Amino acid sequence: MTTGFLQKIFGSRNQRLVKQYQKTVETINALETQIEQLTDDQLRGKTDEFRQRVAAGESLDKLLPEAFAVCREASRRVLKMRHFDVQLIGGMVLHYGKIAEMRTGEGKTLVATLPVYLNALAGRGVHVVTVNDYLAQRDAEWMARLYNFLGLSVGINLSGMEHEQKQQAYASDITYGTNNEFGFDYLRDNMVYETEARVQRALNFAVVDEVDSILIDEARTPLIISGQAEDHTELYVRMNALPPLLERQIGEEKADGTGVEKPGDYTLDEKSRQVFLTESGHEKAERLLAEWGLIGEGESLYAPQNITLMHHVYAALRAHTLFYKDQHYVVQNGEVVIVDEFTGRLMAGRRWSDGLHQAVEAKEHVKIQSENQTLASITFQNYFRMYAKLAGMTGTADTEAYEFNEIYGLETVVIPTNRPPKRIDKQDQIYKTAKERYDAVIRDIRECYERGQPVLVGTTSIENSELLSHLLKQAGLPHEVLNAKQHEREAAIVAEAGRPKRITIATNMAGRGTDIVLGGNAEKQAAFIEADEAIPADEKARRIKQLHDEWETLHEQVKAAGGLHIIGTERHESRRIDNQLRGRAGRQGDPGSSRFYLSLDDPLLRIFAGDRVRSIMDRLKMPEGEAIEAGIVTRSIESAQRKVEARNFDIRKQLLEYDDVSNDQRKVIYQQRNELLEAHDITETISAMRHGVITEVVRQFVPEGSIEEQWDVPELEEALRNDWQLDLAIQEMVNESSSITADEILDAVTTAADEQYEAKVAMVGRESFSAFERSVMLQTVDRLWREHLAALDHLRQGIHLRGYAQKNPKQEYKREAFELFAAMLDAIKQEVTRIVMNVQIQSPEQLEEAAEQIEERTGHLENVEYQHADYAESGAPVANVAAATAATATADMVGSAMTHGHAGELPKVGRNDPCPCGSGKKYKQCHGKLS
């Protein structure tokens, strides 16, 4: 109450910020007359003047009013577009490292030019980040005219570009590209073997378009560069036969033994997208696997030698029960292609991890591709937090303002619209069944079509869009379908979606980034005429004028019919996605309307609010085909959405807390790697490693400060001879001296190792040997880092089970991850020293050949896959994602953990310990019974 009272007096934080920026807008407007007087050359010359002032120490904040005024005038001359006052406010919000929420059609692309121009003056590079290559190329080509006029260079960073093109793009003042490509370039730069092979500069300032999509929707999806690992193709095929033989259990067993409506072999948790085998399911699976000869008679699935099978059992079950064709993936050209659940786009080339993709391929009877090993990975959360300054813009950020602030330290500022909005958002209509809902949708579309009003229908999946398309064909209504299967055409379809009688079906936010203009997009058609050299100039002018006249008529016709009407056929889990769909109507003060049609069969209602709404409908005795339209139901749905949003936020936050551990380690490894690349001579580093390793070896057999009776000299001699190529008669030294100490033995071995090393260097020359050492060290760091990443993933998969032992899983993860990291650093020293001391050299040519072989073995950038696999989607390590993942560690994982000193063997489970399956029961009452 007090807060509301104070807000009335002082205004909200948002209002105060906008008011503050308004004063700067007045300063910019006061400069307009003066700037208008400048010639084109004088206006262009302002850029050099500003650069000199920045170099002399003037801050960008102080330069802002003049730079914005110059950019606005240049835009007016080059693009024939003058920034509105609210767009200047948006530009300031971005410059100060905040998120600008601007409604659809308010000109976000133009707004970005202001802070981008200002920050590019510092000469440290500015990245403009978009969601796909099409938008990156479109915006770069469109705005390059303005930036080039002002004397700034513009680069485009697209996937598949040549190395030199990428370097050129990053060297430009302003670089446009996609979030994926910027992230992958960062990872690739930290996998190179020469400094000249890197493409990125230091990460200075990024403006992220559709910031909610990139920093929130995709925050759970790490970028992964991976290579092929061991082949388990045959096992996936055989496991694919298992799920059809198992039955789903309906209902969860309670403590008193009740709650199961229909017994079965597995249960599903649709919220967390996990599957769990029941006791009978385990018994049945073990019996079938024994019949197929995959496990021994009477063996348990939890036996150490069978853990890899457990991984395959769960992968096959999840593929059959939780992932559906044309909803989560499509089969195209004999390949399983993932569908992005947020945009409905196909994500070609991306694969689910943890064997799920192979299990889906086995289910669809297409060629099974090998499992991959992670070579490098980073989340968008940790990548974008590396920028010195980060800003973003979107039409819908306010519902996620808390998360932006909590995770990225970004404040959200809602920018006022240039004209007051006129869109009417109607109440949701809820039907009992999906059929009744679709009947109502078709009726609404027909009414709009008959009065000449354009309609945009939003669906949540390709399957639903094709179903609706089929129903519209039956109803004889012409329409366009915009989904992941046709996104080459999407910009063209969206541009024309505002014409009279136009019906467009779109999955979620396909076509996002392209405005729907009432009456159609005359500018696009005019551009085609302008580009046609066969048409004479006067004919071009006549046709373009005719186009604009026709557009004026159509524009008024659509406005009179009520503007664009938005129909949502289902509520999304996130209110923000619903708001994005609604936001396509009512741009720049145009009329428009929106309505959502729901049914009790929708996943959101069924899982979170179905019983409550169904009881309301039953009490009201609703006849078939009748909808419920009430505020209480809409509020109930929004409450369900808030629950899902809160849960997703918790998952993202938890993922970040766990990823921060590997991120800190990643920074250390990448920093050391870069120092290694840039160092002219690494002799001192190699020497320190050698002395450290030799000391460890000697101390193992001749402990420091010990007496002769405690020494094991024969074993030391054998270890030095076999492992380090040092043939020393230490026993003779001991026999000849009555007072030799442990330190003197260490000095003797160290001196011998140094002499052996110097002899090799003298044979081939310091420069050649140093190049060989660098290759060895880089290859070793990369290989052990890859194994370490796998070990961290596998540690994270089972770490939540520590909660049953009254331990904090996060603290345990941090502690064990640190131990793994320390073990990896020791392993790097051991491995590098072993290779350098064991290499046999006769000539410099032989050394070069050895270095080439090492680099060939590490030619990982030639045969890799770039994935953006959703961890939470694929059951990968989010700490509290269902306990069943505890059992999905493969035999490789165990081997990897053992290599890193994580565990000597798989721990034996005590009868009274919590069962490893995560049921919460004691082992003797759960899978102990099965063993």
UniProtKB/Swiss-Prot annotation:
Protein topology in the membrane: Peripheral membrane protein
E.C. no: 7.4.2.8
Main location: membrane
Cofactors named for this entry: Zn(2+)
Keywords assigned: ATP-binding, Cell inner membrane, Cell membrane, Cytoplasm, Membrane, Metal-binding, Nucleotide-binding, Protein transport, Translocase, Translocation, Transport, Zinc
GO biological process, one term: protein transport by the Sec complex
Localisation per UniProt entry: Cell inner membrane; Cytoplasm
Protein name: Protein translocase subunit SecA
Record gene name: secA
